[in-house]
């Protein structure tokens, strides 16, 4: 476990508990995703790392870039101020990732990685999501990527479960059985 994860965990847990109490899990997910994306831009990273930029300037930048939602949210503004004062802004991507883990556990959602040979239609995505939800007894969130080297089919990873329905996987299994 990295030091950044250890440092980010209490922030993520506190944000999650606040969002849960306020029943605003998805809103906070959006906020954290946006903040994480902003601090990862080269310009923001350079500005935050610059010793000449003050905490107030960094806070103002984040609130300005993130828009009007942020100006009305005291808890979010306090979070930005706290992270800035403690020099933890660059932990926002880690905080966001940990928050999403807590949220998924709370909502009983499992993130499923699907690597497909070609683009899946919305109907195929819906059928796959329903089938996996039924098999895993949880809601699933599909994270789909394309890999033409699969030659056809798809590779599905859900936690410890791996389903290799790709042509490449079947050819590898056939080659292994013929070699034995």
UniProtKB/Swiss-Prot annotation:
Cellular component GO terms, alphabetical: plasma membrane; proton-transporting ATP synthase complex
Molecular function via GO: proton-transporting ATP synthase activity, rotational mechanism
PROSITE patterns given in the database record: ATPASE_DELTA
Signal sequence coordinates: none
Membrane topology summary: Peripheral membrane protein
SUPFAM superfamilies the record matches: N-terminal domain of the delta subunit of the F1F0-ATP synthase
Keywords tagged on the record: ATP synthesis, Cell inner membrane, Cell membrane, CF(1), Hydrogen ion transport, Ion transport, Membrane, Transport
Cellular localization per UniProt: Cell inner membrane
Alphabetical list of InterPro entries matching this protein: ATP_synth_OSCP/delta_N_sf (IPR026015), ATPase_OSCP/d_CS (IPR020781), ATPase_OSCP/dsu (IPR000711)
Described purpose of this protein according to its UniProt entry: F(1)F(0) ATP synthase produces ATP from ADP in the presence of a proton or sodium gradient. F-type ATPases consist of two structural domains, F(1) containing the extramembraneous catalytic core and F(0) containing the membrane proton channel, linked together by a central stalk and a peripheral stalk. During catalysis, ATP synthesis in the catalytic domain of F(1) is coupled via a rotary mechanism of the central stalk subunits to proton translocation.
Matches recorded under PANTHER family: ATP SYNTHASE DELTA CHAIN (PTHR11910)
Family listed: Belongs to the ATPase delta chain family.
Protein name stated in the entry: ATP synthase subunit delta
């Amino acid at each position: 476990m990295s030091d950044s994860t250890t440092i980010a965990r209490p922030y993520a847990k506190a944000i999650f508990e606040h969002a849960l109490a306020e029943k605003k899990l998805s809103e906070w997910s959006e906020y954290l995703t946006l903040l994480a994306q902003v601090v990862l831009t080269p310009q923001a990273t350079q500005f935050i790392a610059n010793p000449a930029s003050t905490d107030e300037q960094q806070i103002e930048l984040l609130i300005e870039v993130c828009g009007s939602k942020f100006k009305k949210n005291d808890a979010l503004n306090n979070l930005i101020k706290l992270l800035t004062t403690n020099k933890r802004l660059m932990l926002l991507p880690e905080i966001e990732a940990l928050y999403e883990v807590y949220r998924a556990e709370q909502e009983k959602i499992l993130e499923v990685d699907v690597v497909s040979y070609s683009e899946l239609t919305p109907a195929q995505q819906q059928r796959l999501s329903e089938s996996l939800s039924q098999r895993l007894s949880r809601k699933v969130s599909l994270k789909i990527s394309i890999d033409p080297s699969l030659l056809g089919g798809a590779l599905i990873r859900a936690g410890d479960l791996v389903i290799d329905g790709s042509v490449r996987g079947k050819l590898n299994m056939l080659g292994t059985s013929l070699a034995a």
